[in-house]
Amino acid sequence: MKNNTKFDSTVLKTGRGLLAVSSAVFAVAGLGAANAHAHGFVGDRFFPPTIATDDPFATDELLLPSLSYFKSAGSPATATTDGGFEFDKEIFPHFALGIAGDYLHLKPDGEPASTGFDDFTLSAKYQLWQNDAHEAIFSIGGEWEMGGTGSKQVGADSANTFTPTIYFGKGFGDLPDSLKYARPFAVTGTVGEDLPTSSDPNNLEWGFALEYSLPYLQSQVKDIGLSAPFKNMIPLVEFSFSSPENRDGGKTTGTINPGVLYESKYFQIGAEAIIPVNNTTGSQVGAVVQLEIFIDDIWPKWFGHPLIGNDK
């Protein structure tokens, strides 16, 4: 999912947000949230789907919708509004395939706007290892940005890009009692290498999320009496970067995304600011909101298990 620069796709594929949508979904969430029962557990730790970086779980997922606004640097600078989706399905135990797409509205300064789909992306992920006692997980996989599947009006590439990636997650529930209030902390992250079939530069795509789970604090450390909606929230900060490695690719670009996730049994709503790390990335703060539907809890007959085999 590339738009003019690899950085744009890194920001836009994650989640796409407007405060009005966020407020509406939070109002629906108030109908009664419970502890999340969807995918993403290692031991007692629930790792939520993150927005700017991918989580390490090969499970059934439906991200719909994902909305964002960000103004990237350039001559001219371009304001991008993005509506996206992602669907992943576990095929074999611990192995999932996915597809994602984005519909873009681009408005360069002083020029007419253009709209259209960016290139669609296929993904594969395999959970290679996990340790429940130490709340740790490691996965391998990658993405295939399918060149020629998007609109040239929004700068979709005609060439393919393959990005082999490693994914990791670590919760800190194994810390000693003297550090018990640090146990709700967890980190997830990814490291990938772009391999374009064109003359575009190779990029190191890397990022991580640092989160503090209030549901984990309440259930696994100490019930401090938080009420809804706070007891269902996970504050986090995400860091997402793209570092060109050759072919005069320029400087590293990226964003820092502080925000919060709200967990219920059937869905997650997340909202983050998009803060550029340098002038090469952009000069204005953007916003993103994303709705993740836990389809394995809504339709357990159809989702939450592999098509072939049994992961119990």
Role assignments for model-derived ranges:
Residues 37-312:
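Transmembrane beta-barrel domains of Gram-negative outer membranes and organellar outer membranes
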